[in-house]
Curated annotation (Swiss-Prot):
ClpX-type ZB domain residues: 1-53
Gene: clpX
Protein name per its UniProtKB record: ATP-dependent Clp protease ATP-binding subunit ClpX
InterPro entries, per the entry: AAA+_ATPase (IPR003593), ATP-dep_Clp_protease_ClpX (IPR050052), ATPase_AAA_core (IPR003959), Clp_ATPase_C (IPR019489), Clp_protease_ATP-bd_su_ClpX (IPR004487), ClpX_bact (IPR046425), P-loop_NTPase (IPR027417), Znf_CppX_C4 (IPR010603)
Tree of life domain: Bacteria
Species of origin: Streptococcus thermophilus (strain ATCC BAA-491 / LMD-9)
Disulfide-bonded cysteines: none
GO biological process assignments: cell division; proteolysis involved in protein catabolic process
Length: 408
């Protein structure tokens, strides 16, 4: 009996332990591996992956290099681009410092960023461009879809799941990624006084976000949705994730005006001329954001404040034509595949920009306006073999005439 039992005994092909010495042995094609060797392999892979991630971060572009990258894709907002370049560089420098230092005397805080600016001013695009230039996982979340745990809506941990998915479930990469939370102004408290009722989408969500922004080990449901007691969770440390939050903060300029006006009355001094909304945006301080409805603890975790300016007609025309992936260049490339040249008159570009401003859509509305103008042209051109050039005029943008077609 003993001989038969010995013949049936299964041994791990790697450490040589038998099935009675370990908890589990997994059988492969003529090969066996025990649970202890699996755990050891996972730890080795984890350490090597972490080293690879840190090596990538060591090559973080310097602020001037980041600014050059942003300038290739983003028009205007020079002050904001400089602030972002410095904040992002310092963030990844902090990670390298923390991972490699031997002493624990200096605790470097994260440079999370709050971007304030009107719709279509480039908040999301700036964050996307930064993440792409750094080759780190990037996720976008909408604050309006978030609610406190226990209420119908999306838990804040689902933001982390999006980042994990963007990292192809490589947790080490995800832990050094960037998350952009849009519409953050929509979860502001409805007033400075604390309500006795539950604030499902306001202060409660800010408190929930606060935990993951400042750094915590969060439990994330791998399939998303609500947490269940028996569900297996993904553990992710958020201390090195860079959070960029943004919002339009409509009406905050009135808070700034009130604060600046009070100073004039109080001290009898002439304040510097502030003639437009954009100038007021440059004057925003933490006190104004708190009055708008973000709680002090939340504001305190967003030390870098970047206020974007309202884009002008000239800015939007530059956005249409100058960046590497400018919309005009994209449509010119599309028509070139049909052997047709595309040209926009200067006043046509200005008319497109003016429409975007009238619609209050900013840069994000430019594509839909061009689509309206170009739809019939793009429908007809593939069937018109004699057309060599299309010229878009102001009249075509205004809907008063068709684009001009030139033939050979």
């Amino acid at each position: 009996m003993a001989g038969n039992r010995n013949e049936e005994m299964v041994y791990c092909s790697f450490c040589g332990k038998n099935q009675e010495e370990v908890k589990k042995i997994i059988a492969g094609n003529g090969v066996f591996i025990c649970n202890e060797c699996v755990a050891l392999s996972q730890e080795i892979i984890r350490e090597e992956t972490a080293e690879e991630v840190l090596a990538d971060l060591a090559e973080t572009p310097k602020p001037k290099e980041l600014l050059d990258i942003l300038n290739n894709y983003v028009v205007g907002q020079d002050r904001v681009k400089r602030a972002l370049a410095v904040a992002v560089y310092n963030h990844y420098k902090r990670i390298n410092f923390t991972e490699s230092r031997e002493d624990n005397d200096v605790d470097l805080q994260k440079s999370n960023i709050l971007m304030i600016g009107p719709t279509g001013s480039g908040k999301t695009y700036l964050a996307q461009t930064l993440a792409r230039s750094l080759n780190v996982p990037f996720a976008i979340a909408d604050a309006t879809s978030l609610t406190e745990a226990g209420y119908v809506g999306e838990d804040v941990e689902n933001i982390l799941l999006k980042l994990i998915q963007a990292a192809d479930f490589n947790i080490e990469r995800a832990e050094r990624g960037i998350i952009y939370v849009d519409e953050i102004d929509k979860i502001a408290k409805k007033g400075e006084n604390v309500s006795i009722t539950r604030d499902v989408s306001g202060e409660g969500v800010q408190q929930a976000l606060l935990k993951i922004i400042e750094g915590t080990v969060a439990s994330v449901p791998p399939q998303g949705g609500r947490k269940h007691p028996n569900q297996e969770m993904i553990q992710i440390d958020t201390k090195n994730i860079l959070f960029i939050v943004g919002g339009a903060f409509d009406g905050i300029e009135d808070i700034v005006k009130q604060r600046l006006g009070e100073k004039i009355i109080g001290f009898g001094q002439n304040n510097k001329a502030i003639d437009d909304e954009s100038s007021y945006m440059k004057e925003i301080v933490a006190e104004d954001i708190q009055k708008f409805g973000l709680i002090p603890e939340f504001i305190g975790r967003l030390p870098v404040l970047a206020a974007l300016e309202q884009l002008t007609v000239d800015d939007l025309v530059r956005i249409l034509t100058e960046p590497r992936n400018a919309l005009v260049k994209q449509y010119q490339t599309l028509l070139s595949y049909d052997g047709v040249e595309l040209e926009f008159d200067q006043d046509a570009l200005e008319a497109i920009a003016s429409k975007a401003i009238e619609r209050k859509t900013g840069a994000r509305g430019l594509r839909s306006i061009i689509e309206e103008v170009m739809m019939d042209v793009m429908f007809e051109i593939p069937s018109l073999e004699d057309v060599t050039k299309v010229r878009i005029t102001k009249e075509a943008v205004d809907g008063k005439a068709a684009p001009v077609l030139e033939t050979a």
